[in-house]
Swiss-Prot record:
Role noted for this protein: Causes loosening and extension of plant cell walls by disrupting non-covalent bonding between cellulose microfibrils and matrix glucans. No enzymatic activity has been found.
Domain Expansin-like CBD: start-end pairs: 173-252
The keyword Lyase belongs to this UniProt entry's keyword annotation: no
Name by which UniProt lists this protein: Expansin-A4
Similarity comment text for this entry: Belongs to the expansin family. Expansin A subfamily.
Disulfide bonds: 52-80, 83-158, 88-95
Source organism of the structure: Arabidopsis thaliana (Mouse-ear cress)
Length: 257
């Protein structure tokens, strides 16, 4: 009896540790200064796809409140999914009165233009912090003719409906998992997968928020574990049934906000 109780206690502790999440909520960051431009056309069709791998931003739930980040902010793709609050600042000629703020999600990369000076065309050159906004959201804070405006910005918690979405692409020997709709910090810095016949295996970032594994996972129920930049972890146990197919999307547990 004592041995059975010990085994049950050990099992409970292991599952509790695996499912533990760092307490609290993501609190965001302090206000900082940057600049903003716009791209993608009046319907934001030119913002689809992008360096984060989200594809159609409408169907993924990001809409037009999105931005491409300069090198200094993009962080080699690690900032994909992060949310920011922006205000047009210190430019009364072009900023809308009342300095309304907007909330945007990082979905793309604004590449540097080293042939141009950073204050005249090379807006996204390092070390410059710059947001290239989808045109519809830019027009909420400034006039079209401005072209470029100074902004104040800060990281804020991402508020998303539903759970974290995991879309599994690839083939038998190459699994590419796109992670979207992440609440809290919004970005993902570490991801793992567990098959029903395997232990936990780390996924490596392929590009943007696409994470890869070369393990053979076909025919197994899958669990996913992800960690945001705030070090909170969410584990979704057996969320993918064993008969899953490539191209399908599955919903796991999201972070508290």
């Amino acid at each position: 009896m004592a041995i059975k109780l010990a085994i049950l206690f050990t099992t409970f502790v292991l599952f509790s540790l695996a499912d533990a999440r760092i307490p609290g909520i993501y609190s965001g960051g302090a206000w900082q200064n940057a600049h903003a431009t716009f791209y993608g056309g009046s319907d934001a069709s030119g913002t689809m796809g992008g360096a984060c791998g989200y594809g159609n931003l409408y169907s993924q739930g990001y809409g037009t409140n999105t931005a491409a980040l300069s090198t200094a902010l993009f962080n080699n793709g690690m900032s994909c999914g992060a949310c920011f609050e922006l205000k047009c600042a210190n430019d009364p000629q072009w900023c809308h009165s009342g300095s309304p703020s907007i909330l945007i999600t990082a979905t793309n990369f604004c590449p540097p233009n080293l042939a141009q000076p950073s204050d005249n065309g090379g807006w996204c050159n390092p070390p410059r912090e710059h947001f290239d906004l989808a045109m519809p959201v830019f027009l909420k804070i400034a006039q079209y003719r401005a072209g470029i405006v100074p902004v104040s910005y800060r990281r804020v918690p991402c508020r998303k409906r539903g759970g974290i979405r995991f879309t599994i692409n690839g083939h038998r020997y190459f699994n590419l998992v796109l992670i979207t709709n992440v609440a809290g910090a919004g970005d993902i810095v570490r991801a793992s997968v567990k098959g029903s016949r395997t232990g936990w295996m780390s996924l490596s970032r392929n590009w943007g928020q696409n994470w890869q594994s070369n393990a053979v996972l076909v025919g197994q129920a899958l669990s996913f574990r992800v960690t945001g930049s705030d070090r909170r972890t969410s584990t979704s146990w057996n969320m993918v049934p064993s008969n899953w197919q490539f191209g399908q999307t599955f919903v796991g547990k999201n972070f508290r906000v």
